[in-house]
């Protein structure tokens, strides 16, 4: 009498939230690069990190960019950005809708609103 065991392996994606954290970290540490042409080639042959006197190539795991992102805080008709001035923000939020981040360090005015509505309460 013998026994047989079967093992099945598979790859799964990480939880969406974990993936978001990894991408956000990569975004915060992204490296600006510039294309470099070998002497005889017309097309760029590789990318190098864009720093004075730097000849380092980015690592395969680096998130890289060639041009800096536009400033979304200020209005820019060229990119179509309307900026953040005059938008409502959430004073207590820590993410993109929070006043500290959305107002780009310019400061903000606070307004307190009261709202009355019927709640169909029964006592």
UniProtKB/Swiss-Prot annotation:
Taxonomy, superkingdom: Eukaryota
Residue pairs linked by disulfide bridges in the UniProt entry: 89-104
Entry keyword set: Developmental protein, Disulfide bond, Extracellular matrix, Glycoprotein, Lipoprotein, Secreted, Wnt signaling pathway
One Pfam family in the UniProt entry: wnt
Post-translational modification: Palmitoleoylation is required for efficient binding to frizzled receptors. Depalmitoleoylation leads to Wnt signaling pathway inhibition.
InterPro entries: Wnt, Wnt7, Wnt_C
GO molecular function: cytokine activity; frizzled binding
Lipidation (O-palmitoleoyl serine): 1
Cellular component, GO annotation: extracellular space
Main location: secreted
Subcellular location: Secreted, Extracellular space, Extracellular matrix; Secreted
Example of a GO biological process term: neuron differentiation
Stretches for region Disordered linker: 33-61
Gene3D superfamilies named in the record: 3.30.2460.20
Function noted in UniProt: Ligand for members of the frizzled family of seven transmembrane receptors that functions in the canonical Wnt/beta-catenin signaling pathway. Plays an important role in embryonic development, including dorsal versus ventral patterning during limb development, skeleton development and urogenital tract development. Required for central nervous system (CNS) angiogenesis and blood-brain barrier regulation.
Family: Belongs to the Wnt family.
Protein's recorded name: Protein Wnt-7a
Record organism: Plethodon jordani (Red-cheeked salamander)
Chain's gene name: WNT-7A
């Amino acid at each position: 009498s013998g026994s047989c065991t079967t093992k099945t392996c598979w790859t799964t994606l990480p939880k969406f939230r974990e993936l978001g954290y990894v991408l956000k970290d990569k975004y915060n540490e992204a490296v600006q690069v510039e294309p470099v042409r070998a002497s005889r080639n017309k097309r760029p042959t590789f990318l190098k990190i864009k720093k004075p006197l730097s000849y380092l190539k980015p690592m395969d795991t680096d998130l890289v960019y060639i041009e800096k992102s536009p400033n979304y805080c200020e209005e820019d008709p060229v990119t179509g950005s309307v900026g953040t001035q005059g938008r409502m923000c959430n004073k207590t939020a820590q993410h993109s809708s929070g006043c500290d981040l959305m107002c780009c360090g310019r400061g903000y005015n606070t307004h307190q609103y009261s709202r009355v509505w019927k709640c169909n309460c029964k006592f």
